[in-house]
Swiss-Prot record:
Keywords, alphabetical: Copper, Disease variant, Membrane, Mitochondrion, Mitochondrion inner membrane, Primary mitochondrial disease, Transit peptide, Transmembrane, Transmembrane helix
Gene: COX11
Pfam (any one): CtaG_Cox11
The protein's name: Cytochrome c oxidase assembly protein COX11, mitochondrial
Organism encoding this protein: Homo sapiens
Mitochondrial intermembrane topological segments: 115-276
GO CC terms of this entry: mitochondrial inner membrane; mitochondrion; protein-containing complex
Length: 276
């Protein structure tokens, strides 16, 4: 340090230690001048400055004092630039509005999914679901097709979230188009608390769903079972006589009716329909 020092020079802690000659002040020295301690001038100034700082390092004066910071870029006064910024803000607000609307729509659709699915499937017979077309006058006037025997197989499944015992009371029955049939499923709640379940159904083959008409069933309805309670749930149905006239059904001799029970969140409690 002594070899670098000259009489009248001072050690300036600005972006690394520098020796500033008083006769040739630089802009950096002038800007740092208000921060120099009086005792740093003279022969021992550099040594005392280093002892006070502790080590050689980059200065942080520019970050600590506004006088040493570069001038801020003023906001653009260009009308075109301002228009671009306003357009960008407007587009961002529009995007947020669309995202919020989609989120609300998806939430509403999730609540309406089961009723809409039930209405659609029962009306069209698509998705392998039965058709709700069983007017009493039609049932009374149906003519059974005796030479067309169909085997109806029954299947039962329970979702992993529902701790129920669920099974068909019969594995299969034989019917003919144009006559009604009655089958039963049995469900039991083996737990020590009330549980509410809800079921969906499916029919295989897919094309036979439009001819499989349910007069009474327990699908899409909440079923509440108390601890250890067991119930028999009926399925009253018939195969439309037009089944025998459809060329696609010529080789169809087996129809499978399958139910799957899921656990339902408790909303309004519905009684078990028609089990008395």
């Amino acid at each position: 340090m002594g070899g670098l020092w000259r009489p009248g020079w001072r050690c300036v802690p600005f972006c690394g230690w520098r020796w500033i000659h008083p006769g040739s002040p630089t802009r950096a020295a002038e800007r740092v001048e208000p921060f120099l301690r009086p005792e740093w001038s003279g022969t021992g100034g550099a040594e005392r400055g280093l002892r006070w700082l502790g080590t050689w390092k980059r200065c942080s004066l520019r970050a600590r004092h506004p006088a040493l910071q570069p001038p801020r870029r003023p906001k653009s006064s260009n009308p075109f630039t301002r228009a671009q910024e306003e357009e960008r803000r407007r587009q961002n607000k529009t995007t947020l509005t669309y995202v919020a609307a989609v989120a609300v729509g998806m939430l509403g659709a999730s609540y309406a999914a089961v009723p809409l699915y039930r209405l659609y499937c029962q009306t069209t017979g698509l998705g392998g679901s039965a058709v709700a077309g069983h007017a009493s006058d039609k049932i009374e006037n149906m003519v059974p097709v005796k030479d067309r025997i169909i085997k109806i197989s029954f299947n039962a499944d329970v979702h992993a979230s529902l701790q129920w015992n669920f099974r068909p009371q019969q594995t299969e029955i034989y019917v003919v188009p144009g006559e009604t049939a009655l089958a039963f499923y049995r469900a039991k709640n083996p737990t020590d608390k009330p549980v509410i379940g809800i079921s969906t159904y499916n029919i295989v083959p897919f094309e036979a769903g439009q001819y499989f008409n349910k007069i009474q069933c327990f699908c899409f309805e909440e079923q509440r079972l108390n601890p250890q309670e067991e119930v028999d749930m009926p399925v009253f149905f018939y195969i439309d006589p037009e089944f025998a006239e459809d060329p696609r059904m010529i080789k169809v001799d087996l129809i499978t009716l399958s139910y799957t029970f899921f656990e339902a969140k408790e909303g309004h409690k519905l009684p078990v329909p028609g089990y008395n």
